[in-house]
Amino acid sequence: DRLCPKQKKIKMACEACEHKEWAKLTLDKIVAHLVGYKEDGSDVLGMYPLLPDGTCRFLVFDFDNHEKGAQETDFANTDNEWQDEVNALRRMCEINGIKPLVERSRSGRGAHVWIFFKKPIPASVARNFGFMLLDKGASSVNLKSFHYYDRMYPSQDMANSIGNLVALPLQGLALKSGNSAFIDDNWNAYPDQWDI
């Protein structure tokens, strides 16, 4: 069985997987991601944000449910409190002149907050900046910390491995339900995802 261990809910670094087969990105794969042919999500594309020189072109904050047993529901949150945390981070970005893109997760019960840079910057600088935004965002809404914040991509400061994979947005099947979509301040999917 050559199915990705992550699809079987097994935690494993991609570079350590005996089944890894790095494949070239093709137009067919991009179309499959955007259309969503496969119910099991095996046509979903992801990206390693950490570049070989230790830089990155974007930063992603992942907000989801990391309670015990959450993997059974694809880490979907069970209430809407996570939206307050995402909104706090969004506000901190906007106060500092940054226009983040917020993506509702595939399940519709979590989010990715994307910040793109004009040029590659050291991952350590991006991550320190991200932690500062989280700290300021938490204090702006009187939180001791973000409960639903799970991790930041890239997850490493330096390129000693390929890093962690982040699923790309606009996944065809999820998008049909308004998920895996970029959303506005009212949590509505933008009508034209290509014109944001």
Map each language-model feature to its residues.
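DNA replication initiation modules
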Residues: 44-83, 118-196
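Signature for HUH/AEP ssDNA processing cores
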Residues: 1-109, 116-132
